[in-house]
Amino acid sequence: MGEQQQQVERQPDLPPGFRFHPTDEEIITFYLAPKVVDSRGFCVAAIGEVDLNKCEPWDLPGKAKMNGEKEWYFYCQKDRKYPTGMRTNRATEAGYWKATGKDKEIFRDHHMLIGMKKTLVFYKGRAPKGDKTNWVMHEYRLADASPPPPPSSAEPPRQDDWAVCRIFHKSSGIKKPVPVAPHQVPAAANYQQQQQMAMASAGIIQVPMQMQMPSMSDQLQMLDDFSTTASLSLMAPPSYSTLPAGFPLQINSGAHPQQFVGNPSMYYHQQQQMDMAGGGFVVSEPSSLVVSPQDAADQNNNAADISSMACNMDAAIWKY
């Protein structure tokens, strides 16, 4: 029953929706300065007293006067390593608090220095090989740089012996991937869909066209069917220009130049050409690919003459 009564007394009576979240200037002006002036008589319902050297950071939320918050406030006294020194003992049983960054100056009305804020991070283990954690502490103290009094002095403790500490656990800061909406479509597909909708609204019917390549059996059938002029026109040989009847072919072999006349019947030619007049065209008839016996004999004679001359010459130069 006594523990429940103490728990009720520890909880401040705040209206729903209110949170204890003072600014840096408010912490120095309304909570730290009065505590330094009257350390025994001044007490705040939202801030308790704790010895940070005897508590681990994960145990501090249970010792706070305000539960259910993401940050916790405490009054603490500095434990100096040496009576006449400025260094503070920040070690606990499981680790130590290490200062990081530069101290921040706290001003009143943007021109009067009233306090300092130091940021510390808790490390597990012993320095300098401790493991960094996400526990962070902001230590607020008054702006007083006077040296500490000697141990035998009867003067009151210094102003910076007391501090307000704000403890919180920093999140890891891992960003979650942004999910892609299932209704999103690429820009090209969206544009094509808009074009189809526009054509449908205008009454235009789009019929897909499919081109088919002729199969091998169709090509063989066209070769066999010589009676169809259109089919033969697809397989017609290319047109070659025939040489004139008296076109000489001269071979220089030293002092005995020789020439012979080419036979126009040696070259393929078509009997008729395509007529493009009148906006149309006429498919030419298939040309004959058969060589007469007389032409074949002339070709053999010419080939024999060329072979005999090529064997006897040392350096032949062909002139057309």
Curated annotation (Swiss-Prot):
GO molecular function, a single term: protein homodimerization activity
GO cellular component labels: endoplasmic reticulum; nucleus
Domain NAC, first and last residues per copy: 14-170
Signal peptide: none
Keywords from the UniProt entry: DNA-binding, Endoplasmic reticulum, Nucleus, Transcription, Transcription regulation
Disruption phenotype: No visible phenotype under normal growth conditions. The double mutant nac20 and nac26 exhibit a floury grain phenotype due to decreased starch and storage protein content.
Location relative to the cell: Nucleus; Endoplasmic reticulum
Main location: nucleus
TM region positions: none
Example GO BP: regulation of endosperm development
Tissues expressing the protein: Expressed in developing seeds. Expressed in developing endosperm.
DNA-binding region: 114-176
UniProt-recorded name of the protein: NAC domain-containing protein 20
Gene name tied to this protein: NAC20
